[in-house]
Curated annotation (Swiss-Prot):
Residue numbers binding a ubiquinone: 201
Pfam families: Cytochrom_B_C, Cytochrome_B
Species for this entry: Cephalophus spadix
Taxonomic placement: Eukaryota, Metazoa, Chordata, Craniata, Vertebrata
Protein name as catalogued: Cytochrome b
Name of the gene encoding the protein in the UniProt record: MT-CYB
List of residues binding heme b b566: 97, 196
Length: 379
């Protein structure tokens, strides 16, 4: 009797990706974040779909419709807070996933890595547009400030901003198009995630040692399916603790005030997951320079395969690089803290030093450390 799992065109794809996939036997919990990101994406699409059923993308009713969801729709409050805090969990998983890739040299799979960077940009764009939809004070002013950054582009900047706004300020046209894009983007992300997996399965997974694991592979199911289920349960536990005990912990109180173009909030700041990039943007006194630094702070990931000078792929056996990696993590945490602080002494200088340190670590210190470690191997 033929096994449908291995003959049916659709089942064959599922089988080769999630069941009979040969997987390294030594991948740690840092390899769980890929599946967790998939779960986050599905959760966001489902909660988002139900929110879209009750939301109205109009400047006069957007804020009221979100209030209506929380007060009048059955379980609307939990759907709304799962969606808002689900985005935070999504970014926590994203940062862990990227960090894992940097530490263990997963960027050596250049196609997979580059698709991953595109996925990161797409997710950030989606989250930004989603933040505008409740049409609170921080939604409106966040949209105004961030879209305005494009006016720093020489010659076409101003026209570009007005084209995105659909007018001369952030208004109804902007909200409507942001809702349309926010709805479609997660499906584009899902398609890109499939391409990401397609490229990954061309080479197979990396592992903590960074050396070939062809000699020691195990089937994905049941070993890693059960491991992924454990990860998923912990993710959902963390999300539900956040949603049910302190749903507004990561939000901004200003967003509970309806958008008012005549009143600027004292401190305009994005959601916590953008603060590191926002701090880099603010540390440069020039507008165009700041925008370039902002884009480069994430685009720099594309250069990782080129900046890899070590003879070893993973950082597992490279103590100097390990030390620099954790300094980079601390630096990003510092930038995140600075991004949420007002623009005044001493925060300005701390932010500038942390921004310089960020680029210095990635572009200079880490490649140098790798070269030193290569030479130490000869002794």
């Amino acid at each position: 009797m033929t096994n449908i799992q291995k003959t049916h065109p659709l089942m064959k794809i599922v089988n080769n990706a999630f069941i009979d996939l040969p997987t390294p036997s030594n991948i740690s919990s840092w390899w769980n974040f890929g599946s967790l990101l998939g779960i986050c994406l599905i959760l966001q699409i489902l909660t988002g779909l139900f929110l879209a059923m009750h939301y109205t993308a109009d400047t006069t009713t957007a804020f009221s419709s979100v209030t209506h969801i929380c007060r009048d729709v059955n379980y609307g409050w939990i759907i709304r807070y799962m969606h808002a805090n689900g985005a935070s969990m999504f970014f926590i998983c994203l940062f862990m996933h990227v960090g894992r890739g940097l530490y263990y040299g997963s960027y050596a799979y250049t196609e997979t890595w580059n698709i991953g960077v595109i996925l990161l940009f797409a997710t950030m764009a989606t989250a930004f547009m989603g933040y505008v939809l409740p049409w609170g004070q921080m939604s409106f002013w966040g949209a105004t400030v961030i879209t305005n950054l494009l006016s720093a582009i020489p010659y076409i900047g101003t026209n570009l901003v007005e084209w995105i706004w659909g007018g001369f300020s952030v208004d109804k046209a902007t909200l409507t198009r942001f809702f349309a894009f926010h709805f479609i983007f997660p499906f584009i992300i899902a398609a890109l995630a499939m391409v990401h997996l397609l490229f990954l399965h061309e080479t197979g997974s990396n592992n903590p040692t960074g050396i070939s694991s062809d000699a020691d592979k195990i089937p994905f199911h049941p070993y890693y399916t059960i491991k992924d289920i454990l990860g998923a349960l912990l993710l959902i536990l963390a999300l539900m603790i956040l949603v049910l005990f302190s749903p507004d912990l990561l939000g901004d109180p200003d967003n509970y005030t309806p958008a008012n173009p005549l009143n600027t909030p004292p401190h305009i700041k994005p959601e916590w997951y953008f603060l590191f990039a926002y701090a880099i943007l603010r540390s440069i006194p020039n507008k165009l320079g700041g925008v370039l630094a902002l884009v480069l702070s994430i685009l720099i990931l594309v250069l990782m395969p080129l900046l890899h000078t070590s003879k070893q792929r993973s950082m597992m056996f490279r103590p100097i690089s390990q030390c620099l990696f954790w300094i980079l993590v601390a630096d990003l945490l510092t930038l995140t803290w600075i991004g949420g602080q007002p623009v005044e002494h001493p925060y300005i200088i701390i932010g500038q030093l942390a921004s310089i340190m960020y680029f210095l670590l990635i572009l200079v210190l880490m490649p140098m450390a790798s070269t030193i470690e290569n030479n130490l191997l000869k002794w």
